[in-house]
Amino acid sequence: GPLANLSIKLKQDFLYYWLSEEDNLILCGKLDWLEYLKEIEAVHIIDFKTSKKEENPTSLQLPIYYLLAKNCQSRPVEKLSYWYLEYDTMPTRQDLPDETESKNKVLEIGRKIKLARKLENFNCPNGKDGCLYCRDLERVSRGEGEKVSESSRHDLYFVERDKPTED
């Protein structure tokens, strides 16, 4: 498989570049794997997936990785793939995103996040009940979590789950 092939070792694990100097927005992220396609002097971005659930086709993860690879290293991006480790023996190739469209989408979201931070107004698009990704964080911010560990980079909180009701 691709892991036995040549790969690109980037100078830094965490890639970043100015998405918009005018808006003071930097795009950053970490690529799982960059396979080197020697015969065409290009790269293949592989994103390892540990979940059994397939990635949403509208996810911006691969477009973000594409922008990072395009702007943080010199070789063209020839291929993008998800590799679902639970059930695939090889990566599943995805379409290359349009660079301009990807940049515009990411920039639009970056501007919204920047404005929300400035106004301290973090409204979840899923309404007052929040979403799977922010419910626990919101509970911690309301003081409902118990801090159980602290390090220079992370704080760990325990949040008790609501017990399901029986009908």
Tell where the protein language model's regions lie, with residue ranges.
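RecB-family 4Fe-4S metal-dependent nuclease core
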Residues: 1-167
